[in-house]
Regions:
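A short, polar/charged loop/turn motif at coil->beta-strand junctions and beta-hairpin connectors
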Residues: 147-149
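Surface-exposed, low-complexity/disordered segments
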Residues: 140-144
Length: 299
């Protein structure tokens, strides 16, 4: 028990130890003001009930943890977060990883077909390859895919969750979000946001996709689609951005239409990173910019 007025804490701990396994259980309450404790310089206080259980078996590389927060409340510089219940669970052995987060109408799930040690090893192998993207301005998708660990991540949320509360403090929000990321034989990501709002502007639908395709040279394709219903941002009734990353080349093509189907933009560009130079070219020869047709110089 701690009775500091800025760190009120009462915890009960129990557990067991044996050569084969360890178990632990913890319950209690925590009420703390990190700003008053001078650990941070901005408003940050947390109050919650806590229940934690853990299991470790080193011989079988088996680990399990369940964390449950009740009557959780947090005051942050830009927002206040509150929920009756937040649960985090994870378990792994030498063959798999499972993890989940639940709170309100928010759900996140993560799975992998390899154990935690192998997962971390592959992540460490991928870091140098990711670093070379910045250093050499080149994406080696084949090499990256070979070292990325296999996994699946799924997340969805509506209006009653901590994400919404956090975004509200920044004058942002949405009605529903779905995100799926998978790395198996190929990397694939899809996402959709309904009624995304920021700064008084609302976009009815945002759809994102990111996927790997094996051709002459492995490419990472991306696509962003914006759609708005009649009466909302009619000049941006439809916006589609498509492109890919491959080696030292990236390509982007944009088509924007108004409610009447007129094209406000139809233009693409390709950027080639050559040592210390960036070579940029535009297409097609007669792009549409600002609802008018233009002619590009041959150079």
């Amino acid at each position: 028990t701690c009775t500091d007025p800025n760190l009120l804490m009462g915890l009960s701990v129990s557990g067991s130890l044996s050569p084969e396994e360890y178990t632990a259980d913890l319950t209690g309450e925590i009420h703390t003001d990190l700003e008053a404790l001078k650990l941070v310089t901005e408003a940050c206080s947390v109050s919650t009930g806590l229940s934690l259980s853990g299991y470790v078996s080193p011989m079988s590389e088996s680990y399990r943890a369940d964390i449950r927060l009740s009557d959780f409340s947090a005051l942050l510089p830009t927002s206040r977060l509150q929920t009756n219940a937040l649960s985090i669970s994870a378990e792994t052995d030498s063959t798999h990883i499972n993890a989940a987060v639940r709170s309100g109408d928010m759900a996140m799930n993560f799975v992998s077909s390899i154990g935690f040690s192998s997962f971390l090893e592959k992540l460490n192998q991928s870091l140098p390859i990711i670093a070379t993207v910045q250093e050499e301005k080149r994406l080696d998708m084949k090499a990256l895919h070979q070292v990325l660990p296999p996994f699946e991540f799924h997340a969805n949320a509506k209006r009653n969750n901590l994400i919404q509360q956090y975004l509200k403090g920044m004058n942002m929000g949405f009605s529903q979000i779905d995100l799926n990321i998978q790395n198996d034989t190929l990397l694939n990501t899809t996402g959709k946001i309904d009624r995304f709002s920021t700064g008084g502007i609302t976009i009815d639908t945002l759809q994102l996709s990111l996927f790997e395709r094996r051709e002459k040279e492995e490419r990472l394709y991306y696509s962003l689609q914006v759609g708005n219903k009649p009466g909302n941002l009619d000049q941006l009734a439809s916006v589609i951005l498509n492109g890919f990353l491959s080696g030292n080349t990236t390509k982007l093509f944009c088509v924007q239409k108004n409610r009447q189907g007129q094209e406000g933009f139809r233009i693409g560009c390709q950027a080639d990173f050559l040592d210390s130079l960036i070579q940029v070219s535009f297409f097609p020869k007669n792009p549409i910019i600002g609802f008018e047709t233009w002619t590009l110089n041959p150079d």
